[in-house]
């Protein structure tokens, strides 16, 4: 039972007409700790009880079960609860230390399946910094949902189909050099793609050639398929190298091409329900009643659009995985599109249309500039990660020149710094990336949190105690209460992050926990050999465990030494 649930249970005796969950929803945390740990407002009862809130509070406090509280007092229209800090603190520490790996878990998902579609880079292009957001928001959301007992199916829906591959094949036909591609596949293919886009305005025939190549691909042309397989293979090899650096693993790499083989079903369903309407030689689905633009299903030249493939994908995933949710981690600019996708599924008669959820995010800017592959100013994610590792290595060498596993720690700190900088921001906000600000050991950074955790581990090594089963945890001291109380709020943070698909909640929690521990460390002689030392070390262990857990939810490593 959480502290909040304990307060709700105490109030339930005085409010038998209210459900305990209703009571819990009304409980607040006072901004000023002098007003208690929890407060229950009585304004909402005034209308039904026909009494002033102050009088209601005074009458209710007489009926509240005050066992387990230091005191319960009336403050105007509020009932303020002061927890028995020594006992509550000991209970929090005991819960963490007994099973740190599972601390904070709550059962929201009941093991139901959730598909999550994220990262999804286009083949024949390098993974740029623009892919970082979808990849890391998706991975963190997946980990957070696993923490609340959902079963996640991670899908990298590769952009391996569409007219852009027709363009690339047209470019390769005109300027391609097989030896050059084999030597440096991704950058060479990118060079061809950028060139055909840059020259298309002066040469409209290039665009037409691209359309024709894609039509050949759709109709099974042998040469088109040979090129497609080659481009896909070399791309996936490069993507896997980046995913390994980020510790991201997928259950499926089925992309648009996989769905392109399954389009007959949604097209036939749309025809059967008389939803396909002719429009200037093409066929569309009218979504006027949803105040949405029409969906283009089949173009005037007979080729399909990506919405057709997405409809096929949605049907396949529901049938294959029986999901309770189907999540798509895609930029905010696609918001209207996902409304169209949901509306189309609803029109087709699928009652699970609302299981499709768009987890949107803002742009990633590099020093204030948006990135675009078409114009060629793509910044390689792999290069940025390596630069970040190099910068971390230099800073670690200055701080701890004798560190044995310095290279491994530099990787964990450098990669973690890039991930944390992305995830500490609310996902819908734009993020500006500047490497020098990211790999700092001070401020709101990943290395700051990792360093706080490494500091805790250093203290524990010096303290020499790792078994706290016989320690009197009530002796941690009054100065430890703020830190212990915050440890007790971890499951609330996880729940909030899960319900809102918002990893920044966990990142901010980790930052705040690191700050509170550093303040505690600055004002408390943790290693002083007195009767309270084992309890202080137990608290330090609990902080280390929860910081490691929070970082893991963000897919960030927690080095024991830095």
Swiss-Prot record:
<dbReference type="InterPro" id="IPR008909">
    <property type="entry name" value="DALR_anticod-bd"/>
</dbReference>
<dbReference type="Pfam" id="PF03485">
    <property type="entry name" value="Arg_tRNA_synt_N"/>
</dbReference>
<feature type="short sequence motif" description="'HIGH' region">
    <location>
        <begin position="121"/>
        <end position="131"/>
    </location>
</feature>
<dbReference type="InterPro" id="IPR001278">
    <property type="entry name" value="Arg-tRNA-ligase"/>
</dbReference>
<dbReference type="InterPro" id="IPR009080">
    <property type="entry name" value="tRNAsynth_Ia_anticodon-bd"/>
</dbReference>
<dbReference type="Pfam" id="PF05746">
    <property type="entry name" value="DALR_1"/>
</dbReference>
<keyword id="KW-0648">Protein biosynthesis</keyword>
<dbReference type="GO" id="GO:0004814">
    <property type="term" value="F:arginine-tRNA ligase activity"/>
</dbReference>
<comment type="subunit">
    <text>Monomer.</text>
</comment>
<protein>
    <recommendedName>
        <fullName>Arginine--tRNA ligase</fullName>
        <ecNumber>6.1.1.19</ecNumber>
    </recommendedName>
</protein>
<keyword id="KW-0436">Ligase</keyword>
<keyword id="KW-0030">Aminoacyl-tRNA synthetase</keyword>
<dbReference type="GO" id="GO:0006420">
    <property type="term" value="P:arginyl-tRNA aminoacylation"/>
</dbReference>
<dbReference type="InterPro" id="IPR005148">
    <property type="entry name" value="Arg-tRNA-synth_N"/>
</dbReference>
<dbReference type="InterPro" id="IPR036695">
    <property type="entry name" value="Arg-tRNA-synth_N_sf"/>
</dbReference>
<keyword id="KW-0963">Cytoplasm</keyword>
<dbReference type="GO" id="GO:0005737">
    <property type="term" value="C:cytoplasm"/>
</dbReference>
<dbReference type="InterPro" id="IPR014729">
    <property type="entry name" value="Rossmann-like_a/b/a_fold"/>
</dbReference>
<dbReference type="InterPro" id="IPR035684">
    <property type="entry name" value="ArgRS_core"/>
</dbReference>
<keyword id="KW-0067">ATP-binding</keyword>
<dbReference type="Pfam" id="PF00750">
    <property type="entry name" value="tRNA-synt_1d"/>
</dbReference>
<dbReference type="GO" id="GO:0005524">
    <property type="term" value="F:ATP binding"/>
</dbReference>
<comment type="similarity">
    <text>Belongs to the class-I aminoacyl-tRNA synthetase family.</text>
</comment>
<keyword id="KW-0547">Nucleotide-binding</keyword>
